[in-house]
Amino acid sequence: MIEEEKIDENELEEDKFIQKIEKLNDFQDEHKYLFRVCLLGDAGVGKTSLLTRFCDNYFFENYNNTIGIDFRVATLKYDNIISKIHIWDTAGQERFRSLSLNYINNSHGFIFIYDITSSLSFEKVEKWISLALQKNNHTVANFLVGNKSDLEQERKVSKSKAEDFAKKNKLFFLEASAKNHINVEKLFYYFLYKMVEFYKTNEYIEDANMKLTTEKTEEIPTERESEKSCFC
């Protein structure tokens, strides 16, 4: 099991690493690393909204709930290293839970998402964490994200409460708004940053559940006939 590092409370506030990251055309095939991250949370918290904002720079007021698994690819360059990220958007409904488990097993990191206007969605995060880490406790970077920060007047979950929860569970924390495009890039860029920095110094980790996926060994989910790429 990879030991979680101590979280620097100010680290997410430092944007220096973001300035070093470039989003590339996703037809760019050559890459050194391929990382997988799974979006987890109840239906309606905005998982698809965050993903669509990041990949397409677009926001829909009304989304249909994800059925099964959606899948996008982002190609990013950091520190002169080109990486691809497979981003798996999982359905939040109970009936799709078993399908989500297949992708949880192969993730390098998790992004647990709740709606700041819904206390219930925040309470359910603990169950998502338990489910995910029970199946895969070899992840490198896990996040807690309070989505819909644009709805401050409807807030039900205080930022301090979420911060305390994140510290307790060794999660990186931020609030975001897919609608107002706040902290969306920072979230996915920070995931990439943590992954690249980790593997630059741990190239030879031998762990059956955390094998580094490199160029020419991409694994495409069988549920989808073709991948969708991220464009901006």
Question: How should these model regions be labeled?
Answer:
Residues 83-98:
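Switch II (G3) loop of P-loop NTPases
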